[in-house]
Amino acid sequence: MEEENATLLTEFVLTGFLYQPQWKIPLFLAFLVIYLITIMGNLGLIAVIWKDPHLHIPMYLLLGNLAFVDALLSSSVTLKMLINFLAKSKMISLSECKIQLFSFAISVTTECFLLATMAYDRYVAICKPLLYPAIMTNGLCIRLLILSYVGGLLHALIHEGFLFRLTFCNSNIIQHFYCDIIPLLKISYTDSSINFLMVFIFAGSIQVFTIGTVLISYIFVLYTILKKKSVKGMRKAFSTCGAHLLSVSLYYGPLAFMYMGSASPQADDQDMMESLFYTVIVPLLNPMIYSLRNKQVIASFTKMFKRNDV
């Protein structure tokens, strides 16, 4: 009876970051610049790969899709944050919240699978170089890409489905700068223990599987590199894997800490700085990490601009 008489909430307040009023415009401009650079960098990388037929190979097909997912991840979070910097009210409707959570969950999960697939690609390239063209074909790459997106979609649908069993009546204040699953569950009027369990099981399983794939791949890669007698060969192998290892470390570090450490009703509020790092900063850095020392990408980028000038 109490639940029936309670007023259902359909709007929420995103608290966002705490800052002095005079910092509102500088913060808005800073995040706007970051977002624009992120979108230009990732879409630029996609354009370079799309335009150059020489880059239509598994390594760059995976990189192009990573850039697409990074652009989606950044957009799903940053656009609403930019609006809230200037808006008097930081309200978000329940439907908007679910849409944001859905797009966020798809992009985050898909990126996990993509990073694992890229690690496998590096394993085959370094440990089985002669068999690489036969094993890592474009057909296999496309199938792995489809599985990555399907995995992201299913994971998002699971959490969206379980959200429909919840009602929100008491508090409408989300202690975050976007609609993330954990802060939303914490203000649920309905018992959200099952939802927390689903987060722990599915998010945990995905992270264990993808991180495990990355670790196992690089254990074999490291073993193969150490067997190489040529210093030049070792440098080339490290150069091939360095960018991906850095990207994986930056992405999985805060992500694993947040979702494996906070998926319980008693856990403290999420550290928003950790969320900011992997939703805003990592998508900004990835195009630079993968492009600046990649001679093929730089050469293709230069060619594309020369053609445009002509």
Curated annotation (Swiss-Prot):
Protein's cellular compartments: Cell membrane
Q: Which residues lie on this side of the membrane: Cytoplasmic?
A: 50-56, 120-143, 217-240, 293-310
Instruction: Please give the Pfam families that the UniProt record associates with this protein.
Output: 7tm_4
GO CC annotations on file? plasma membrane
Which keywords annotate this record?
Answer: Cell membrane, Disulfide bond, G-protein coupled receptor, Glycoprotein, Membrane, Olfaction, Receptor, Sensory transduction, Transducer, Transmembrane, Transmembrane helix
Q: Which superkingdom?
A: Eukaryota
**What Gene Ontology molecular-function terms does this entry list?**
G protein-coupled receptor activity; odorant binding; olfactory receptor activity
- This chain belongs to the protein called Olfactory receptor 5H14
- Origin organism of this chain? Homo sapiens (Human)
State the encoding gene.
OR5H14
